[in-house]
Regions:
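Active-site acidic/histidine proton-transfer and metal-coordination neighborhood
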Residues: 64-65, 80-181, 191, 264-267
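Histidine-acidic metal/acid-base catalytic patches
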Residues: 1-6, 14-30, 58, 64, ...
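Short beta-strand segments at enzyme active-site cores
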Residues: 33-34, 70-75, 113-120, 154-157, ...
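Active-site-proximal loop/turn and secondary-structure-junction residues that shape catalytic pockets
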Residues: 11, 36-38, 76-79, 120-124, ...
Length: 281
């Protein structure tokens, strides 16, 4: 396995986007994970999609100028998980979510990207869980078809608060939708005290990977406090033939204690660890 390292542009929200990309390039990453997070990242879909082609070409140029590949485009349609969830019970909301996804496919294609991540949806308290799940499968299947039609791989991030919040539910969801894969982030499971060995089988279902420190009770922790065995993760990736990027993804937001570590230092520490242990992978 040739280790390909990316870094999230949304790891450094206090910098301008240009300076964030400068920093990622200075740190020697191969690629950048680009966040399209409505209301809370450098790049908002509502601001980009008005002149989509121009916005996409501008981003592609910035990445190229810095020698960075576009590792992933990560769509989040709203600051919360619910209001524009892909499996929302309201048909009009689902149509809005589909339109945003279609535009993201177009944007990614214009940028020269090959991978899109998004959130899977939630379980709605107003209906049986099975209805939320059935609608989720339908919506994700539609997205897989739209992305695959343009040569793009589509993946969901199984996250805290989602309809796929455990390794078992995440695996079941991915396996139930043809063409679907995972943007795998151990930390969303580690936070709940789930052991690495329970998460590890998901690597075989992943097309993208997020890495940062975590421990029980903390979605994001320092490298010193981290309990995830990333050396074993890299070895498992080699065994299963993983070919995607490993994205170092520290975030700085006032949610789940995710503003309590030094993102720059932690990014460097984890980058160096991954390079050391991935050299022979």
């Amino acid at each position: 396995m040739a280790l390909k390292l990316a870094c999230a542009d949304f790891a450094f929200p206090l910098l301008s986007h240009d300076h964030s990309l400068d920093l990622i390039a200075m740190l020697g990453f191969d690629g950048a994970d680009i966040g399209l997070f409505e209301g809370r990242s450098h790049l908002w879909p509502s601001r980009l999609f008005g002149d989509l082609k121009r916005s996409a070409r501008a981003l592609a140029g910035k990445l190229s100028d810095r020698g960075l590949e576009l590792a992933d485009v990560f769509l989040q349609t709203a600051p919360d998980f619910v209001s524009i969830a892909p499996n929302h019970p309201d048909l009009q909301v689902r149509r809005q979510a589909r339109e945003l996804f279609d535009r993201t496919v177009e944007f990614t294609l214009e940028c020269g990207g090959k991978h899109i991540s998004a959130l899977p949806g939630v379980t709605f308290a107003t209906e049986p869980e099975s209805e939320s799940l059935d609608r989720c499968r339908d919506e994700l299947a539609w997205r897989c078809e739209r992305a695959a039609g343009q040569g793009i791989v589509f993946a969901i991030e199984a996250h805290v608060g989602s309809i796929a919040s455990t390794p078992l539910t995440a695996a079941a969801l991915v396996r139930s939708v043809p063409g679907l894969s995972l943007t795998l982030d151990y930390t969303h499971f580690t936070r709940g005290g789930i052991a690495d060995l329970e998460i590890e089988p998901l690597i075989a279902l992943a097309s993208h990977f997020h890495a940062r420190g975590a421990r029980a009770g903390r979605l994001q922790a320092s490298f010193q406090e981290n309990v995830i065995d990333y050396a074993r993760v890299l070895e498992t990736m080699r065994k299963v033939g993983y070919t995607g990027y490993v994205g170092v993804e520290y975030v700085w937001i006032d949610w789940e204690h995710c503003n309590e570590v030094d993102n720059l230092s932690e990014t460097v520490l984890l980058r160096d660890f991954l390079r050391l242990h991935g050299a022979g992978a």
